[in-house]
């Protein structure tokens, strides 16, 4: 009998990728914001109790530096207290907890790739609240996988994240995109993350913290340049400084990550090719995953 996975945030970018990779081997119970409010912990408790999952995968978070600066209480509850509550339920209900963190828990000081051994030092409220959630999970439950991931590209149903926003602008006829060339991360394909999560689980890796990212580092400009070229889009992509755009919180300008625990994933440029091939095939929504 297949194990039961409760996937919280099942229609987001990471949720779609996980459903695609895990669907044949697990019974997946997908829940999104239409089904429950992650700020209402009693609703969360009820959904988990009714689902009786063997594994809970949480992709729900309050994303973004500026949104967190605007709504600090919401950021704290969703990114810190909500994962803490999931960790407590993991202990009491006996399920394996899988949670996703971010490269934004690091500062810009290292000048090299951050690994699992590096000590986080958040620069902004987003990173601070996410790191708080990480700490609670590590302190409260023993049966967990905590995956730190960088900026993601991948199939999506909403145009509410960086790559989708840029592609929407192109779709609307914009011919020139000015994009930050001085924010460096490790662009990563959501499906590659999902495959690696599967591999780690299937091989019964030791519980704990893992960094998952495509190999290499790049700016947001580099990423969109690569995507638009692979899709043969009629648009000019220009590099700019992040300081040319409005912002509230302190930016993470150099946070590429890699793992010292697992083998490197394919290079981010190869991952972009795979992503763009899927876009050209019309693979966008969960109906076609």
Segments and roles (model prediction):
Residues 235, 252-289:
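C-terminal amphipathic/interface module of NAD(P)-dependent oxidoreductases
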Residues 3-21:
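N-terminal Rossmann NAD(P)H-binding glycine-rich loop of SDR-like oxidoreductase domains
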Residues 42-78, 91:
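NAD(P)H-binding glycine-rich loop region in Rossmannoid oxidoreductase-like domains
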Residues 135-185, 191-192, 198:
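NAD(P)-dependent short-chain dehydrogenase/reductase
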């Amino acid at each position: 009998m297949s194990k039961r996975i409760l996937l919280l945030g099942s229609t987001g970018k990471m949720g779609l990728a996980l459903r695609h990779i895990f669907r044949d081997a697990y019974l997946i119970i997908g829940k999104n914001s239409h089904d429950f409010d992650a700020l209402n912990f009693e609703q969360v408790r009820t959904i988990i109790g009714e689902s009786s999952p063997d594994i809970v995968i949480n992709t729900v978070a309050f994303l973004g530096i500026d949104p967190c600066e605007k709504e600090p209480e919401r950021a704290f509850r969703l990114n810190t207290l909500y994962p803490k509550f999931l960790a407590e339920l993991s202990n009491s209900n006996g399920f394996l907890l899988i949670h996703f963190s971010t490269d934004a828990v690091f500062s810009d000081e290292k000048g090299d790739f951050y690994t699992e051994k590096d000590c986080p030092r958040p620069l902004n409220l987003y990173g601070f609240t996410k790191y708080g959630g990480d700490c609670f999970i590590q302190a409260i439950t023993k049966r967990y996988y905590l995956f730190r991931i960088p900026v993601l590209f991948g199939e999506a149903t909403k145009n509410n994240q960086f790559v989708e926003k840029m592609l929407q602008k192109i779709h609307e006829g914009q011919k020139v995109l000015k994009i930050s060339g001085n924010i460096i991360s490790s662009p990563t394909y959501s499906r590659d993350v999902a495959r690696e999560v599967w591999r780690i689980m299937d091989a019964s890796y030791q519980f704990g913290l893992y960094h998952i990212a495509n190999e290499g580092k790049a700016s947001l400009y580099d990423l969109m340049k690569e995507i638009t070229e692979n899709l043969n889009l009629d648009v000019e992509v220009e590099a700019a400084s992040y300081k040319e755009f409005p912002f509230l919180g302190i930016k993470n300008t150099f946070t590429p990550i890699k793992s010292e625990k697992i083998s490197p994933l394919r290079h981010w440029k190869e991952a972009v090719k795979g992503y763009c091939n899927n876009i050209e095939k019309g693979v966008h929504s969960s109906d076609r995953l």
